[in-house]
């Protein structure tokens, strides 16, 4: 089975506005609400390619329930952990002459919630594939990816990491099957500007 893990999924509220003006009432031309988060995006692409996956991660409140409903409408299996405090974040995307985004913070994830996720992971074996994608919300220790990857490696699980900075660097010793930083994430990780393809190859 393929599993995707998204620590901080979101409902993306996308609105198109002609000539968006700050400080004024703007009428939307088009609106849609979509599940968001790197891991969920991977599950969606896999579904479109004919591969089933199970989406893992944390949800909370009425927005979490809506996120779960929307994901399952796509025919994607879910096994989310419902946390008690806060709501799944809403990210507002305004599309006009330029793109504007307002990203929410997300719910409070406790140590107890983390333990539930680690318990899920402990059942995976060498027939499973795990895709660990995106960043982590505030309050979670930045060694969480390292903890997860050490358990996956111990159980012979194939895993992929799509993240940046310390979250990515700290798991390289566990030899993920694949990492997928884009240009901006490479710049964040190495703390320097990348100008050419040769620069990208050198950092890779």
Residue ranges and their predicted role:
Residues 1-23:
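Positively charged, low-complexity intrinsically disordered leader regions
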Residues 27-87:
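Substrate-binding N-lobe of the ribokinase-like
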Residues 5-9, 58-61, 83, 135, ...:
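Cofactor-binding loop segments of dinucleotide-utilizing enzymes, especially the Rossmann-like FAD-
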Residues 107-110, 136-140, 167-169, 188:
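Short, small-residue-enriched loops and turns at beta-alpha junctions
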Residues 4-5, 80, 131-132, 159-163, ...:
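General beta-strand structural signal in soluble alpha/beta enzymes
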Residues 83, 94-126:
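Conserved phosphate-binding/catalytic loop of the ribokinase/pfkB sugar-kinase fold
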Residues 146-204:
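Conserved phosphate/ATP/ADP-binding segment of small-molecule kinases
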Residues 127-139:
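Short acidic, glycine-rich surface-loop motifs adjacent to enzyme active sites
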